[in-house]
């Protein structure tokens, strides 16, 4: 390809050939692309070549520079060397991109808005690439200096290229002394000396003028191989007659070498200084442009700012640390300072102060990219290190980035994504849609909860952050607040401000709606002129009856120091400056704005305040949480069923007075029992008669002496509904009708869903002592009226005789402890009344006859006669009295059937048969299942209980119920809800240091959920120990390399002191010894303390501190 042809002489073939190497597009123009692409389709070639002033360049920054590479790319750099390409003779900026068999030089314009030409440097002819032209070349890193380009390959080779003024490249050197991948390159003060750091743990210094292929100096941090991730020459050390090189390693250490302190063979085997700044591999470093500071980033999600100068050599901890949200892959200082540019209000306030009072590290921003396919680049500033200043968002993960140099000192960042796309971002451009500013989206007021249910509210102006009281708030001694507020303004404006304060505080009409925005200090020595509170000027709180023409100079009110922080110079307890309200006719200039910000910053005593709030929330009691979380059953013990677990959880909830949760667990147990019973096949009349005959035969053959034992041991053959037994237990609390009821104590009955103990009796026993027993649900027994409202005068006498006879035979019958259930005909024997047309009438009648019973539920099988059903009265209207219902005539056939039924099944427990209509509706697939779903089904009750618990924030109930019933009701509890509840529950348990309970919850989850949770919470721990004396990381590499004595971490190589000694034997605690720490602070071996306290029976600490242990 011809790279130096003129734009006027380009042909169509040249355009097609040029597109092979990538898309040189910076605009969305539909015109054909050429070697020179202008930012606008209407701009001509001649106009694009003309030089423009600064304003025209900034006006044309609406188009982003992008380039799509045709091969896999890894490395990125910038070449600042004048090239004469495409008819341009000015100083151009060039982009160097490297990858797999890829090394291109992209020539761009001075405005960095369009690409002039691209050059393939691998096609250059030389003696080095002619013999190995077909081999794979994988360029891992690139470094440039003037016209020299150095590349580090993945096979340990360093290649050097020279660029001529016409843009042609030629390979001039090839060095292959490294054994593994080259990770970092850097030039030393000129283009003739080159540093290379490799994965093999060595740094080599190359003399590019020499014909030898061997390095001049080889540097190694230790005898064992510690891979070098990055290395850089320090330009600030030449002033002190030194040549310092810094490097970071996989061990997390930062090493400092002096190239002039080499041995006789020209090699260095130990660093001059070494600092352990990271708890994992350190992946990047970059030296400050002006000071002897270095920033390092590592996989431990930290960015460390460290002073490596001679005066700070004894320091082992970084001066600043930025906690990021991911492992840091690359970190860079900005190319230009922020002093010359006009930024936001915070930077304006900082620049208005004295330069000597500003930290010089604040002048430069820090950019970092992240590991693990993160598509962002975060820009930080040490003045606000907790919140990113800006964030660049990319569609694909970012592979590499650099700060771009330009003639306008703009903050430009060039990125290279894993989709092989080059992008340029201008951080000074406001309308950059892929650059966000998190500080602008944050609120001034924030609320945070702690683990004990208390919360704190923080109130802070977003531009006032960590301002030094001694340096910035230099208020003159003896000056008043009003004088400080008006300081820096014109005398007329100052007088207006004070006049507003005197007038506004005396008028109750002009007082702001927000009465107090500050905290009163009772120790204040200065009294306000009036007793009315000071009005606060805010956006959104107007002042009635006020009309002033002051400029918009109101600042956000600030809170002063607390009583413990009050000094002689800060005795005023009210807000900073006396605020001035907004005016509708305000036109604030930039000079006025910066002046007011500067003076208001000086006048305030503090920039933020935190208000802790303690709320004794009953539902968030610490004791209740610990008891429920530790005693709730989340899995089935041996010999227990799901119903047993629900009842035990109900008793646990009742023990902490959580009555509603207790009743929910009981309700779920009853509903679950009914669900199991409904799965049984209904019994026909013939089966019931056969079973009854077998029972009569057994009764005749059993002696009277063994009746009681048989009752306890023989399994119950009755399969009556447990719901009937449950509601029958409440007959002693309320009644229906005028007749008496027969209540017999029943014994435990086993079913196939129980564990040998009648759990319903536990419910009845516990419910009688609770407030819920007064509103219990029960079946009514009509004694003067049958199911159709027909009188039973003739049957009363027969029933009375039968009851007397049954009372005498109670001791002989093994079924005497069970309540009789009347068997209805097919027309009345429906367990589930699906239409339920008479439920409201039955309930109304029950409420009228028994006003003291709050909740009465009648069986759905009650059917009234046609005379009642055809009544013109509405459902909720007045129901005829019971005597009127009793006079209704009944058919003879019904009387005959009831008589035969009572004679056959009197005193026997049977299961009501399900009607054919219900069976047909259940087996029909044409009906709507939603219409057939009953509200008291188990899954419906479970869903309603979970929804209510979510609204109440009951994470314990949600998590416990999800773990117990997820496999049973997968259609009710989704997998997302399961993961959300359980993961949140585990997080809370870990915050409360209930680690055993958290592990129990994790192990009790379902198999598919457990594997996902284990990836989050079951991770390997990387423990790092620090010296208790000098607070340095315990590495002890010196003693490990010397291999003398017993190696361990019970001593420190830096301060040569032991970490801990036994208070009893005064020997170091090392090895696998168990160390016990006492409350007084002393510690010792477990065996020593056991001998002191247990065998010798001492009560005080053996260290002589007179602390009574027992």
Curated annotation (Swiss-Prot):
Gene3D superfamilies: YVTN repeat-like/Quinoprotein amine dehydrogenase. Pfam families: WD40, zf-RING_16. One of its GO terms (biological process) is positive regulation of macroautophagy. Residues 791-813 have a biased composition (Basic and acidic residues). Keywords: Metal-binding, Repeat, Vacuole, WD repeat, Zinc, Zinc-finger. It comes from the Eukaryota. The keyword Zinc applies. GO terms for cellular component: cytosol; GATOR2 complex; vacuolar membrane. A zinc finger (RING-type) spans 1062-1105. Residues 552-574, 734-743 have a biased composition (Polar residues). Residues 38-48 have a biased composition (Low complexity). WD repeats lie at residues 132-171, 177-216, 223-267, 277-316, 348-390, 393-426, 439-483, 637-675, 860-906. The keyword Repeat applies. GO terms for molecular function: zinc ion binding. PROSITE patterns: WD_REPEATS_1 (PS00678), WD_REPEATS_2 (PS50082), WD_REPEATS_REGION (PS50294), ZF_RING_2 (PS50089). It is found in: Vacuole. May be involved in a process influencing telomere capping. This is Restriction of telomere capping protein 1.
């Amino acid at each position: 390809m011809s790279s130096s042809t003129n734009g006027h002489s380009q042909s169509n073939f040249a355009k097609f050939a040029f597109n092979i190497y990538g898309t040189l597009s910076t605009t969305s123009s539909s015109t054909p692309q050429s070697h020179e692409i202008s930012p606008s389709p209407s701009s001509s070639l001649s106009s694009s070549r003309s030089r423009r002033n600064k304003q025209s360049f900034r006006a044309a920054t609406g188009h982003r520079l992008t380039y799509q590479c045709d091969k896999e790319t890894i490395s990125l750099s910038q070449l600042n060397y004048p090239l004469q390409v495409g008819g341009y003779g000015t100083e151009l900026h060039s982009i160097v991109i490297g990858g797999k068999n890829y090394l291109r030089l992209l020539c761009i314009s001075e405005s960095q808005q369009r690409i002039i030409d691209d050059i393939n440097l691998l096609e250059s002819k030389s003696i080095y690439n002619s013999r190995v032209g077909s081999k794979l070349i994988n360029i891992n890193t690139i470094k440039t200096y003037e016209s020299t380009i150095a590349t580090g390959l993945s096979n340990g080779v360093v290649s050097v290229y020279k660029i001529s003024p016409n843009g042609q490249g030629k390979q001039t050197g090839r060095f292959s002394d490294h054994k593994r991948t080259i990770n970092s390159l850097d030039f030393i003060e000129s283009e003739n000396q080159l540093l290379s750091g490799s994965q093999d743990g060595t740094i080599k210094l190359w003399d590019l003028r020499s014909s030898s292929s061997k390095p001049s100096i080889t540097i190694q941090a230790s005898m064992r191989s510690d891979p070098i991730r990055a290395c850089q020459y320090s330009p600030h050390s030449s002033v002190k007659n030194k040549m310092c090189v810094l490097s970071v390693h996989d061990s997390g250490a930062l090493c400092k070498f002096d190239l002039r302190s080499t041995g006789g063979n020209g090699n260095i085997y130990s660093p001059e200084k070494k600092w352990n700044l990271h708890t994992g591999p350190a992946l990047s470093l970059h030296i400050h442009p002006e000071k002897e500071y270095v920033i390092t980033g590592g996989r431990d999600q930290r960015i460390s700012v460290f002073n490596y100068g001679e005066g700070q050599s004894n320091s082992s901890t970084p001066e600043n640390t930025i906690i990021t949200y991911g492992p840091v892959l690359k970190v860079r200082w900005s190319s230009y300072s922020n002093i010359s540019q006009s930024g936001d209000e915070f930077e304006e306030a900082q620049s208005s102060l004295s330069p000597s009072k500003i930290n010089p590290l604040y002048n430069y921003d820090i950019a970092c990219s992240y590991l693990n396919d993160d598509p962002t680049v975060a820009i930080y500033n040490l003045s606000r290190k907790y919140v990113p200043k800006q964030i660049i968002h990319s569609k694909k993960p970012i592979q590499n980035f650099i700060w771009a140099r330009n003639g306008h000192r703009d903050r430009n960042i060039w990125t290279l994504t894993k989709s092989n796309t080059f992008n340029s971002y201008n951080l000074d451009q406001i309308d950059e849609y892929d650059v966000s500013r998190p500080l602008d989206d944050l609120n001034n007021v924030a609320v945070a909860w702690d683990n004990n249910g208390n919360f704190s509210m923080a109130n802070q102006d977003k531009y006032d952050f960590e301002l030094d009281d001694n340096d910035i708030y230099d208020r003159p001694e003896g000056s008043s607040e009003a004088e400080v507020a008006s300081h820096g303004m014109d005398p007329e404006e100052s007088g207006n401000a004070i006049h507003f304060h005197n007038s506004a505080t005396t008028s109750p009409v002009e007082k702001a709606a927000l009465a107090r925005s500050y905290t009163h200090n009772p120790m204040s020595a200065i009294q306000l002129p009036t007793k009315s509170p000071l009005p606060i000027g805010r956006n959104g709180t107007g002042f009635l009856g006020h009309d002033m023409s002051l400029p918009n100079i109101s600042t956000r009110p600030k809170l002063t120091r607390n009583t413990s922080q009050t000094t002689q110079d800060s005795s005023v307890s009210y807000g900073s400056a006396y605020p001035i309200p907004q005016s509708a006719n305000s036109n604030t200039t930039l000079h006025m704005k910066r002046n007011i910000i500067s003076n208001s910053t000086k006048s305030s005593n503090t920039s933020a305040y935190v208000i802790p709030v303690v709320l004794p929330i009953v539902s968030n009691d610490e004791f209740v949480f610990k008891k429920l979380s530790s005693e709730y059953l989340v899995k089935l013990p041996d010999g227990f069923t799901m119903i047993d677990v629900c009842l035990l959880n109900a008793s646990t909830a009742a023990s902490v007075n959580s009555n509603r949760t207790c009743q929910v667990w009981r309700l779920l147990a009853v509903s679950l029992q009914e669900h199991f019973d409904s799965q049984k096949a209904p019994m026909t009349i013939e089966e019931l008669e056969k079973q009854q005959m077998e029972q009569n035969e057994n009764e005749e053959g059993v002696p009277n002496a063994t009746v009681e034992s048989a009752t306890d041991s023989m399994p119950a053959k009755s399969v009556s509904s447990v719901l009937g037994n449950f509601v029958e237990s409440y007959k002693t609390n309320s009644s229906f009708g005028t007749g008496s009821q027969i209540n017999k104590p029943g014994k435990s009955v086993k079913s196939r869903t129980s564990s040998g103990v009648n759990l319903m009796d536990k419910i009845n026993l516990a419910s009688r002592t609770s407030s819920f027993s007064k509103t219990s649900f029960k079946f009514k027994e009509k004694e003067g009226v049958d199911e159709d409202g027909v009188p039973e005068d003739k049957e009363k006498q027969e029933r009375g005789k039968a009851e007397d006879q049954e009372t005498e035979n109670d001791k002989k019958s093994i079924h005497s402890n069970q309540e009789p259930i009347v068997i209805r005909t097919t027309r009345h024997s429906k367990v589930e009344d699906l239409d339920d047309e008479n439920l409201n009438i039955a309930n109304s009648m029950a409420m009228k006859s028994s006003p003291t019973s709050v909740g009465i539920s009648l069986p759905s099988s009650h059917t009234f006669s046609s005379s009642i059903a055809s009544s013109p009265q509405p459902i909720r209207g007045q129901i005829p009295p019971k005597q009127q219902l009793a006079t209704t005539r009944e058919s003879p056939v019904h009387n005959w059937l009831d008589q035969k039924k009572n004679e056959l099944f009197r005193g026997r427990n049977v299961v009501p048969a399900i009607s054919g209509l219900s069976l047909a509706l259940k087996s029909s697939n044409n009906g709507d299942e939603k219409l057939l779903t009953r509200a008291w089904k188990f899954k419906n009750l479970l869903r309603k209980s979970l929804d209510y618990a979510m609204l109440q924030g009951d994470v314990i109930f949600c998590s416990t119920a999800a773990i117990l019933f997820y496999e049973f009701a997968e259609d009710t509890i989704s997998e997302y809800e399961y993961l959300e509840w359980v993961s949140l529950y585990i997080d809370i348990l870990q915050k409360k240091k209930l680690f055993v309970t958290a592990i129990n919850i994790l192990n009790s989850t379902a198999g598919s959920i457990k594997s996902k949770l284990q990836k989050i919470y079951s991770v390997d721990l990387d423990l790092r120990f620090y010296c208790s004396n000098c607070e340095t990381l315990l590495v002890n590499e010196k003693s490990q390399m010397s291999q003398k004595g017993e190696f361990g971490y019970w001593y420190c190589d830096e301060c040569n002191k032991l970490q801990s000694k036994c208070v009893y034997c005064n020997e170091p605690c090392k090895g696998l010894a168990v160390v016990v720490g006492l409350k007084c602070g002393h510690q010792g071996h477990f065996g020593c303390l056991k001998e002191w306290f247990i065998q010798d029976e001492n009560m005080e600490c053996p260290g002589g501190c007179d602390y009574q242990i027992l």
